């Protein structure tokens, strides 16, 4: 079972927007050393929308090769084209990914039936474990619990990243699906509470900069040690909030640059973190002990 703290890994870039393979390797080592339980390569935090297909697969391949089976690698292969999602999912399987994460199609706003058929088609086309990803605040496409329930009956659809931050919604999903269907948080601030309801982990932005703390948080929550998990979460809350001072992954890439783990590259239409946000994010990092 894929569970625990799963980092939504950024994709490091140089100042011209080219992929920085040395920094990628450094980040993967950082997570292997700091207790991250799984790596999500080229999800939406990894700027999947602005990588071409060749770059997308090369990042996944390099992460898979470096991890070498020590922890699961989940490949982000979702998008708003069903055909392209099939292509990416098939390629991710070929380079050795353990599972794929598929965001709901953005912009084109499919109906619930369209969502069902989209994900069913990908699952039938590629025999690899697949995790649904619902983040309506970014996609303007909300996959309702009844649609999740229908999709959960497809053998290789194994779980969902529920990133609404709505615990009532998460509870409804948990109530509708079988016990072996994995429900993950995609919202760092509410992840502890979702796991205490029965969720199996957190696909995390904060884990990029505080992997050990997020791993400890997830382990405590999944053991049912609510007081310990909540105490860690309270300590991390300033960071959870500061990492969304601007659109993700702008703040988290700046934070990693500040920590000396990567350069200062990001791709348009995203831009580097605004100067007015530097000190608030720096202060949050210091509060949480990730920056001296």
Swiss-Prot record:
Domain of life: Bacteria
Reactions this protein catalyses: L-aspartate 4-semialdehyde + pyruvate = (2S,4S)-4-hydroxy-2,3,4,5-tetrahydrodipicolinate + H2O + H(+)
Top enzyme class: lyase
Keywords: Amino-acid biosynthesis, Cytoplasm, Diaminopimelate biosynthesis, Lyase, Lysine biosynthesis, Schiff base
One Pfam family matching this protein: DHDPS
Pathway where this protein functions: Amino-acid biosynthesis; L-lysine biosynthesis via DAP pathway; (S)-tetrahydrodipicolinate from L-aspartate: step 3/4
Site keyed Part of a proton relay during catalysis: positions: 44, 107
Binding positions for pyruvate per the UniProt entry: 45, 203
Protein location: Cytoplasm
Any one of the GO BP annotations: lysine biosynthetic process via diaminopimelate
Main localization of the protein described in the UniProt heading: cytoplasm
Active site: 133, 161
Matches recorded under PROSITE patterns: DHDPS_1, DHDPS_2
Gene Ontology terms for molecular function: 4-hydroxy-tetrahydrodipicolinate synthase activity
Annotated EC: 4.3.3.7
Keyword Lyase: yes
GO (cellular component) term, any one: cytosol
InterPro entries: Aldolase_TIM, DapA, DapA-like, Schiff_base-form_aldolases_AS, Schiff_base-form_aldolases_CS
Assembly and oligomerization: Homodimer.
Family: Belongs to the DapA family.
Function of the protein: Catalyzes the condensation of (S)-aspartate-beta-semialdehyde [(S)-ASA] and pyruvate to 4-hydroxy-tetrahydrodipicolinate (HTPA).
Protein name: 4-hydroxy-tetrahydrodipicolinate synthase
Lineage: Bacteria, Pseudomonadati, Pseudomonadota, Gammaproteobacteria, Pseudomonadales
């Amino acid at each position: 079972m894929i569970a625990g703290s799963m980092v939504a890994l950024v994709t490091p870039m140089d100042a011209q927007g080219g992929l920085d393979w040395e920094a990628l390797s450094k980040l993967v080592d950082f997570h292997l050393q700091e207790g991250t339980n799984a790596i999500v390569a080229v999800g939406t935090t990894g700027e999947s929308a602005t990588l071409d297909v060749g770059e997308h697969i090369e990042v996944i391949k390099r992460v898979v090769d470096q991890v070498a089976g020590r922890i699961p690698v989940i490949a982000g292969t979702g998008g708003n084209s069903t055909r392209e999602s099939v292509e990416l999912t098939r390629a991710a399987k070929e380079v050795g990914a353990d599972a794929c994460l598929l965001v709901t199609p953005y912009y084109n706003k499919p109906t619930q039936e369209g969502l069902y058929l989209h994900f069913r088609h990908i699952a039938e086309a590629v025999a690899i474990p697949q995790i649904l990803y619902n983040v309506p605040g970014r996609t303007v496409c909300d996959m309702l619990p009844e649609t999740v329930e229908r999709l959960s009956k497809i053998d290789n659809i194994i779980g969902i990243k529920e990133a609404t931050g709505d615990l009532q919604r998460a509870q409804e999903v948990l109530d509708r699906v079988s016990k072996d269907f994995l429900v993950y948080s995609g919202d760092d601030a509410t992840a502890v509470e979702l796991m205490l309801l029965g969720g199996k982990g957190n696909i995390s932005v904060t884990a990029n900069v505080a992997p050990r703390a997020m791993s400890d948080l997830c382990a405590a929550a999944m053991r049912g040690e609510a007081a310990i998990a909540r105490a860690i979460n309270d300590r991390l809350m300033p960071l959870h909030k500061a990492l969304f001072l601007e659109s993700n992954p702008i703040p988290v890439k700046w934070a990693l640059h500040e920590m000396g783990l990567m350069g200062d590259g990001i791709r348009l239409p995203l831009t580097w973190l605004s100067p007015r946000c530097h000190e608030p994010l720096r202060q949050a990092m210091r509060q949480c002990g990730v920056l001296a």
